[in-house]
């Protein structure tokens, strides 16, 4: 895609879109100007779109300039979807040098942090090793200390001690300490009561999961947590140590006593677990009830919300019913149902209305520039495949584009490719959006119903209606187009009125050569029409060329009756749009209609093709592109020209009558040039220079008339025209031409220094030069039959599409009017009939050329004659030389 969009940064905060656009308008047509904003505040950058790439390149020269006191940065804008993105620069963007340095620094920090943690762990491990070493030494020293071992046994919690762990040790101690046995018995009694030797304390069990015994004071509250973790009391004197040990041993003996029942033994270890469990269960039950209540409340709230939404929806439906003034009384039932049914949202059913772009082949393009033309879209989208139709909707009040377009491809797969590739791309300075398009509406405008009924008495049959419908659908096909087709009755009526004869006298059915005379009369009227169209500024050579590109505003109207008037055609075609000009030939057999806007021309073509006009169907055809030399004059000039034409009408009629008498023996002549008209030759033009650029350069000169750049056909794409690098400027006087050369010779246009001089050949039409660079239509058709080379002019003509009723006598009489005929030959079939083609050989090449130009658009027995140069017969010397070569080959060959 072309770079037609630029990005401007560092804009002033106070800059408006209007002023932003005006600042860049001097470089070309601005199609889009937008300052990016957030929350109503400028983000200090914006985008400018131009219609041409050259304008965008010229606008880049403002880079580094100032708007007010802000130095702006101007650069080419890039699309986010393009793969060729700029190199990242932010430290947060992957791939930038700043981001690389930042990641390296972070990696180094991580390494240092990891090393620091490892060192710290090593230090801690060393400390632990030292501590464990010292502890091992202390343990070794204290292992044999009996007092220390007794202390450890007493300090250790009961849960961590096994019942049988110290039985042997305790028994040994009892033997050694019999003297203190009495004190041990007293302590045993205290342990049986569930109390420790120190007063004021009792044992309770709170944690039912781990069965841990905790000590609590008797006079302390249960909620006092500090008392639970109070320090143990100081140990009694040494004389009580043996008593404590004896009490513990006695308790263990009682635990192992067989006389004690299991229930009594287990009752000692019973704690408050049951109470805690009951409390927890009550809490659980209460939580479940509360959660159920909350669920019920939530459901009720949801129902209330649904009712509110349903009520709102019902109110909206009632308002719609009031606006539409419906008389149905079913609204109450619908409202009741809406309370139960869930809310429904509108969903567009694409499956019914929108076809898949792979089937329809039609795409929808939006956000186009309002100056976009069909030719611009065709250049861009034709690279994906052949385009059948391009439609740009317009506003019929302003006659301007709406910024959208529909493109129909001949092959649907090409539309899919265009949709994927062109969506979001820049076109003429705007980001276009390509979407699948709906199928074209199959509606037709029915006009002149009364005229249609007149065409067939009693109404048209189904077969006839089907045939007419088929003709309308194929009206855009070029296979049956014939630019200069004329009705036979219109030709006869025109000549009969001109020579003041009846049609019967003119035709004279008693004579045998009626078909020949009819063809000659048609040729006479065609030549007369060609001369008239040339006078009206029509390039007649383009009309018969089927390979030329077609216009989208000019229509050729054929098969019209002789009584047709110009105002009738204007009234008929102006129903579908504004006309710029209407050209009707003097014989009233063919007309040219030009619309101002292409869309209106398309509507007129579709609705009037094969429609009844008076009593005959209209044959419409798109005229070749550039068929008019000059654009249509304004309406005020047309009125002044009409008065001039009325005064010269008598002289024109005399000239027409004098030329028609000799039309059969002469060919169409070129329009003579005015003696005062002068042409200036321009060379060394830039390949990108257009006619509009030259017009802007030379229109201010004295006696300026017109300017044209010579073009040639593109070998790769024959429908495309390429500039030749030179052109011609037309002046109405020699003085204006000399003044142009004196002032502007050596000046520069688009960066190229041009050279001006008077034209040697004094060409009146640059299109004639362009035509010389193209192959003629007849020669193009005969390339394949001549070894890939076009046929050269010769005195022999081949006639194709001959009617089977024709005879050699009729063909000789038809061509005798254009020169002396040397021979006529029609190849025949074995059954006696001819094969549909023949050969006519004239005495000179000039006579053959006259016959081809005169009869190239004529009809014989209703068939269009196709004329081409035939290959010249070889003379006797060439035949002898060929025979000698063949004889030598046979002689030298071995059998």
From Swiss-Prot:
Signal peptide: none annotated. GO terms for cellular component: nucleolus; nucleus. It comes from the Eukaryota. Its main location: nucleus. Keywords: Coiled coil, Nucleus, Repeat, RNA-binding. InterPro entries: Nucleotide-bd_a/b_plait_sf (IPR012677), RBD_domain_sf (IPR035979), RBM (IPR050441), RRM_dom (IPR000504), RRM_dom_euk (IPR003954). Residues 101-113, 241-251, 265-278, 296-316, 635-658 have a biased composition (Basic and acidic residues). Residues 317-326 have a biased composition (Basic residues). Residues 451-462, 659-670 have a biased composition (Low complexity). This is Multiple RNA-binding domain-containing protein 1. Residues 96-134, 284-331 form a coiled coil. It holds the Pfam family RRM_1. SMART domains: RRM, RRM_1. Residues 84-136, 172-200, 223-340, 442-479, 634-670, 769-796 are annotated as: Disordered. SUPFAM superfamilies: RNA-binding domain, RBD. Belongs to the RRM MRD1 family. Residues 778-794 have a biased composition (Polar residues). Residues 4-79, 361-439, 553-625, 678-761, 795-872 form the RRM domain. Residues 179-191 have a biased composition (Acidic residues). One of its GO terms (molecular function) is rRNA binding. Gene3D superfamilies: 3.30.70.330. It is found in: Nucleus. GO terms for biological process: rRNA processing.
């Amino acid at each position: 895609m072309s770079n037609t969009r630029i990005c401007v940064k560092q804009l002033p905060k106070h800059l408006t879109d209007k002023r932003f656009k005006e600042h860049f308008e001097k470089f070309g047509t601005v199609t889009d100007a937008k300052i990016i904003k957030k929350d109503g505040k400028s983000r200090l950058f914006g985008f400018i779109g131009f219609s041409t790439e050259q304008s965008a390149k010229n606008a880049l020269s403002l880079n580094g300039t100032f708007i007010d006191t802000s130095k702006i940065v101007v650069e080419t804008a890039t699309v986010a979807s393009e793969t060729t993105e700029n190199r990242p620069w932010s430290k947060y963007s992957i791939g930038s040098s700043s981001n690389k340095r930042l990641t390296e620094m972070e990696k180094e920090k991580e390494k240092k942090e990891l090393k620091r943690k490892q060192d710290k762990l090593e230090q801690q491990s060393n400390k632990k090793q030292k501590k464990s070493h010292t502890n091992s030494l202390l343990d070794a020293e204290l292992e044999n200390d009996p007092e220390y071992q007794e202390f450890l046994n007493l300090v250790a919690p009961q849960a961590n001690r096994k019942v049988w762990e110290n039985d042997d040790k305790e028994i040994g101690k009892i033997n050694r300490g019999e003297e203190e046995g009495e004190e041990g018995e007293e302590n045993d009694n205290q342990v049986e009561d569930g109390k420790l030797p120190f007063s004021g304390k009792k044992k309770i069990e709170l944690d039912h999961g781990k069965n841990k015994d905790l000590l609590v004071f008797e006079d302390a509250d249960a909620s006092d947590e500090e008392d639970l973790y109070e320090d143990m009391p100081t140990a009694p004197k040494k004389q009580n140590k043996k008593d404590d040990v004896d009490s513990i041993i006695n308790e263990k003996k009682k635990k192992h006593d067989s006389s004690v029942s299991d229930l009594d033994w287990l009752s000692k270890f019973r704690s408050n677990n049951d109470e805690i469990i009951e409390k927890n269960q009550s809490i659980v039950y209460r939580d479940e009830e509360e959660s159920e209540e909350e669920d019920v409340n939530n459901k009720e709230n949801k129902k209330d919300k649904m009712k509110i939404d349903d009520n709102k929806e019902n109110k909206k439906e009632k308002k719609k019913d009031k606006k539409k003034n419906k008389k149905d009384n079913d609204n109450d039932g619908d409202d009741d149902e809406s309370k139960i049914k869930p809310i429904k949202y509108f969903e567009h059913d694409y499956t019914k209305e929108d076809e898949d772009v792979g089937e329809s082949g039609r795409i929808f393009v939006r956000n186009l520039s309002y100056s976009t033309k069909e030719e611009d879209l065709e250049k861009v989208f034709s690279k994906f495949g052949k385009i059948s139709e391009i439609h740009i909707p317009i506003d019929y009040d302003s006659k301007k584009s709406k910024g959208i377009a529909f493109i129909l491809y001949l092959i649907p797969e090409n539309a899919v490719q265009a949709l994927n590739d062109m969506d979001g791309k820049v076109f003429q300075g705007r980001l276009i959006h390509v979407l699948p398009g709906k199928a074209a509406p199959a509606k037709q405008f029915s006009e002149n119903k009364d005229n249609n009924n007149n065409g067939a008495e009693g109404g048209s049959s189904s077969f006839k209606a089907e045939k007419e419908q088929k003709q309308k659908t194929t009206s855009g096909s070029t296979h049956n187009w014939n630019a200069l087709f004329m009705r036979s009755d219109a030709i006869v009526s025109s000549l009969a009125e001109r020579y003041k004869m009846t049609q019967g006298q003119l035709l004279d059915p008693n004579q045998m050569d009626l078909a020949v005379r009819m063809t000659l009369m048609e040729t006479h009227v065609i030549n007369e029409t060609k001369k008239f169209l040339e006078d009206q500024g029509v390039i007649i050579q383009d009309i018969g060329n089927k390979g030329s590109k077609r216009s989208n505003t000019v229509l050729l109207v054929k098969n019209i009756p002789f009584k047709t008037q110009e105002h009738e055609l204007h009234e008929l075609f102006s129903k579908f749009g504004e006309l710029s000009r209407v050209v009707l030939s003097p014989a009233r057999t063919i007309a040219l209609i030009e619309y101002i806007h292409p869309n209106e021309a398309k509507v007129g073509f579709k609705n009037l093709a094969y429609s009844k006009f008076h009593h005959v169907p209209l044959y419409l055809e798109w005229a070749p592109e550039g068929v008019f030399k000059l654009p249509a004059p304004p309406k005020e000039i047309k009125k002044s020209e009409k008065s001039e034409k009325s005064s010269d009408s008598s002289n024109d009629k005399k000239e027409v009558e004098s030329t028609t008498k000799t039309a059969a023996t002469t060919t169409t002549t070129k329009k003579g040039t005015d003696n005062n008209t002068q042409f200036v030759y321009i060379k060394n033009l830039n390949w990108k220079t257009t006619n509009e650029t030259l017009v802007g350069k030379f229109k201010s000169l004295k006696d300026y008339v017109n300017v044209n750049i010579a073009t040639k056909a593109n070998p790769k794409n024959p429908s495309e025209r390429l500039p030749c690098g030179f052109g011609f400027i037309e002046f109405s006087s020699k003085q204006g031409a000399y003044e142009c050369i004196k002032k502007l010779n050596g000046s520069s246009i688009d960066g190229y220094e041009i050279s001006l001089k008077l034209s040697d050949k004094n060409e009146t039409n640059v299109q004639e030069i362009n035509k010389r660079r193209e192959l003629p239509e007849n020669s193009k058709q005969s390339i394949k039959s001549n070894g890939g080379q076009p046929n050269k002019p010769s005195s022999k003509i081949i006639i194709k599409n001959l009617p089977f009723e024709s005879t050699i006598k009729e063909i000789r009489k038809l061509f005798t009017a254009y020169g002396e005929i040397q021979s006529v030959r029609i190849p025949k079939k074995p059954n006696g009939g001819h094969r549909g083609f023949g050969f006519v050989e004239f005495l000179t090449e000039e006579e053959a050329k006259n016959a081809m130009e005169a009869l190239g658009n004529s009809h014989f027995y209703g068939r269009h004659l196709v004329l081409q140069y035939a290959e010249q017969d070889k003379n006797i010397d060439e035949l002898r030389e060929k025979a000698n070569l063949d004889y030598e080959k046979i002689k030298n060959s071995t059998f």
